[in-house]
């Protein structure tokens, strides 16, 4: 049986990044991560195949994130740089440039419609098309179509900026 501690150790940073794709506010993002962890903990006994843990966890994460977005609809947003972008770095100019590019990408991903945001965040977490399909309840072909459309939209958004 997989423990919650193992899930957090293996997927904690990925869960934080997924939450960051849906929530800018740090406190609400942290609440979302906690909500995801509680949901995973409650669902772990129903996991039949431990080899499918990754898509199992990510499906729960995305379902909770979608519910969170629905609850927060209409809430005024706050601009806060993602924790994953607060990285002291090499030379200050390069670090600033990298952070600005990463911030633009994060903001562009946040502007994607929900179906495209879901697949892109899972692609960024290195899930295969098959794992994404399983996590989101889609066909592999539909995942491919959504990824291509999301990439095209991101490219357009980033080239306009």
Listing of model-derived features with the role each one plays in the protein:
Residues 2, 75, 83-110:
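Acidic, proline/glycine-rich intrinsically disordered inter-domain spacer in sigma factors
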Residues 110, 114, 125-142, 156:
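Helix-turn-helix DNA-binding module
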Residues 48, 59-80, 90, 95-98, ...:
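Arg/Lys-rich amphipathic alpha helix in sigma70-family domain 2
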Residues 7, 11, 15, 36, ...:
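Residue-level preference for hydrophobic side chains embedded in well-ordered alpha helices
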Residues 119-120:
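A short pre-motif secondary-structure segment
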Residues 31-38, 42, 51-63:
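Structural recognition of an alpha-helix C-terminal capping motif at a helix-to-coil junction
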Residues 62, 136-160:
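DNA-recognition helix of helix-turn-helix
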Residues 1-17, 27-30, 41:
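A short, charge-rich alpha-helical start-of-domain segment used by transcription regulators
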């Amino acid at each position: 049986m997989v423990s919650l501690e193992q899930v957090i150790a293996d997927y904690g940073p990925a869960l934080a990044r997924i939450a960051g794709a849906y929530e800018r506010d740090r406190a609400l993002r942290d609440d979302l991560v906690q909500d995801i962890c509680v949901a995973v903990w409650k669902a772990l006994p129903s996991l039949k195949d431990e080899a499918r843990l990754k898509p199992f966890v990510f499906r729960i994460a995305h379902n909770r994130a979608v519910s969170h977005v629905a609850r927060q609809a209409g809430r005024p947003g706050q601009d806060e740089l993602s924790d994953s972008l607060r990285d002291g770095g090499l030379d200050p100019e390069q670090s600033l440039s990298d952070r600005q590019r990463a911030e633009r990408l994060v903001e562009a991903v946040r502007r994607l419609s929900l179906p495209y945001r879901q697949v892109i965040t899972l692609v960024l977490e290195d899930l295969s098309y098959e794992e994404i399909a399983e996590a989101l309840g889609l066909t592999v072909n539909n995942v491919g179509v959504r990824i291509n459309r999301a990439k095209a939209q991101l490219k357009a958004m980033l080239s306009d900026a």
